[in-house]
Amino acid sequence: MAAVAVVGGQWGDEGKGKITDFLSKDATMAVRSNGGNNAGHTIDIDGKEFKMRLIPSGIFAASKAAVIGNGVVINPEVMFGELDNLEKNGIDTSKLRISNRAHIIMPYDVKQDEYQEEAKGDRKIGTTKNGIGPTYMDKASRIGIRVCDLLEKDTFEEKLRLNLKVKNELFTKVYGKPALKLEDIFDKYYEYGQKMKKYVTDTSVLVNDALDNGEKVLFEGAQGTMLDIDEGTYPYVTSSNTISGGICSGIGMGANRLNTVIGVCKAYTTRVGEGPFPTELLDEVGDRIRDTAHEYGTVTGRPRRVGWFDSVALRHAKRVSGINGLSLNLLDVFSGFDKIKICTAYELDGKKIEYYPASLKELYRCKPVYEELPAWEEDITAAKKLDDLPENAQKFLNRVSELVGVPLVTVSVGPDREQTIVLKNPWER
């Protein structure tokens, strides 16, 4: 049995798609277990860029199956749009498998997300307004519509009718918005269910059987640890558990199944939306990093907030996700810089701390304590091994690993799959 999980070590957008695509070429199965179409990932294949939000990155390379687990919330329109695009580009999509227990993002969930965010005014949290939060709310309230419900016409109609009664009360009486009509939703979504049927199975059984048979299974995390609903910068977080524990519940398997948990990070830090960000750069250095790395959201197109590497946040991610291997991306961005800074601790009310505070008020008062390292002039995008990198780049990598307390397993020096330096094969235990 070989089970490797890839989780975001920062606030998402760390480049998980690239490393999962790289690792999936040796996997029989690639599994996604949380989030929805709020979690974009970009894959470069032979110079062609694919931007996806729902389909697992492993669709390109995993030999047996690319799996959407029960913890994922699915927007059928988005999913079929991605499938159509893949098929037009010659990608085989027949190996997609969808959990019969996954929840469906309904039109009223998208509307509720939009109305709630609008009503918050200045207190908005920066949601993508894709209906992710309300769908997880429906799930927790036990009124959610699952994939298996879409396949049963009578069940689907009954649940939809009841849910619309509840949602329309909210829309008309609280938000002053128009009610939604059953006939505008039912036929379209039932048809989605029929189109989805050929992909649907009990993915918990599928994945656990593969592990029992000694197959290599890759688990793709979505978003990042600092967006986890319990361990992140609450309330500026997503609606699901993005840590490694969420992978287990989001596919239906025991925690003892995971052998390796790889934490993916950038050589700096980014964040989209509102919320505390201790190392944020609001100067020309931040602009330079953003422009060099094209730091704009895959889903929203919004400019990402940019900051120096934060080892305090990554140590927090290591602890709560059990990270035992580090995958660092976008090292090439710092070619031509004079210096690089790493946050080693915070200063809170005159005291040095090395933990990540739960209190937002404390976080906003935290000042980063920096260590400065020299950068390098050389173009490193053709580097194939660690020794090909300039001495200063190697020193930076060693210091990151030392501060986080986790060995590096891969280093990315460019966007293409092959621009990856492997220090340790994650599939080898």
Curated annotation (Swiss-Prot):
It catalyses: IMP + L-aspartate + GTP = N(6)-(1,2-dicarboxyethyl)-AMP + GDP + phosphate + 2 H(+). Its cofactor is Mg(2+). Substrate binds at residues 298-304. IMP binds at residues 13-16, 38-41, 128, 142, 223, 238, 302. The keyword Secreted does not apply. Pfam families: Adenylsucc_synt. It comes from the Bacteria. One of its GO terms (molecular function) is adenylosuccinate synthase activity. The active site is at residues 13, 41. It is an enzyme of class 6 (ligase). Mg(2+) binds at residues 13, 40. InterPro entries: Adenylosuccin_syn_GTP-bd, Adenylosuccin_syn_Lys_AS, Adenylosuccinate_synth_dom1, Adenylosuccinate_synth_dom2, Adenylosuccinate_synth_dom3, Adenylosuccinate_synthetase, P-loop_NTPase. SUPFAM superfamilies: P-loop containing nucleoside triphosphate hydrolases. PROSITE patterns: ADENYLOSUCCIN_SYN_1, ADENYLOSUCCIN_SYN_2. It is found in: Cytoplasm. Belongs to the adenylosuccinate synthetase family. Homodimer. Plays an important role in the de novo pathway of purine nucleotide biosynthesis. Catalyzes the first committed step in the biosynthesis of AMP from IMP. This is Adenylosuccinate synthetase.
